[in-house]
Amino acid sequence: MSQNKEAIHFLSRIANLPKGPVSLDAVLQPSLEDEAELRKLFATDKGNARLKDIHVGLVDVFAAPSDIRTTRARVITGDADRDSQHVMPLPDPQRRKEGSPAMVDNLEAFKKNWNIFTENSLSQLSDWSNVVAAGGSVQACLIPLPKAASASKRAMRKHYHERAFPSSDVDLFLYGLTPQEVRHAPFSYPHFSLTPLWKAEHKIITIYEAVRDSVPWDVICVRTKHTVSIHCE
């Protein structure tokens, strides 16, 4: 995707930061205000022209300069200041150093981490239209791996599933589809064909089947009012 106007402004503010530890408040505040405005538009004016851009409010981090993927350590004036902003502050050994990588370098590295983190459970999902992955699982795969954890796929699995994120799940969100609305797109199901009809529930079934066909374990799908949970070992 191409960077939108808001992303370009944000990247420019990052690029103009001086070297060394520095406060990011002035850089982040305009973006936080813009996000608040977008949230307001989504809630009160969904037909607004700004919302026609499906990437509004987003930054293509891998198409951006390396500044966006570089750690800018928080300015700390003393022990009290280090702990004052956090309920559970990270110990010093876990704090990223100034100038160290804040995320992986490219999309290929992210995909490698993603496949290990998800145990390839979404490898059979060939059509990602109207589906977006977000949340902690994505952030986990963006974070650079410790050297010891990147030695092998086995080491990566132990890092993700036993050390760093032992209870993490994968959050998928549907957009542009509701149970009542019909989207014109081809859909095939084992016992019948729905062409060109496609509803949100059919998309959910497709995701479930993709997970079921990708892992060697039993898969259970549980639907509640607002979510559908897919469980396996």
Task: Give the role of each language-model region.
Residues 1-233:
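Catalytic cores of the polymerase beta-like nucleotidyltransferase superfamily
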